């Protein structure tokens, strides 16, 4: 997910996106713990997407 795409979204859409990412992160962690996760790079990718969304939410709250 590109930061440029995220910047165009509203705070409400960002909160929804954050919730979806956190759910996906949970599911990926459960798959990794049970040994079912084949694409381990997704853990890092989702973690960084969560950070991007949280950063933008903080920026929009301050503005």
Curated annotation (Swiss-Prot):
Transmembrane segments: none
Top-level taxon in the UniProt lineage: Bacteria
Biological processes per GO annotation: translation
A GO molecular-function annotation: structural constituent of ribosome
SUPFAM superfamilies, per the entry: Ribosomal protein L29 (L29p)
Matches recorded under NCBIfam families: L29 (TIGR00012)
PANTHER family, A to Z: 60S RIBOSOMAL PROTEIN L35/50S RIBOSOMAL PROTEIN L29 (PTHR10916), LARGE RIBOSOMAL SUBUNIT PROTEIN UL29C (PTHR10916:SF0)
Protein name per the record: Large ribosomal subunit protein uL29
Organism: Cronobacter sakazakii (strain ATCC BAA-894)
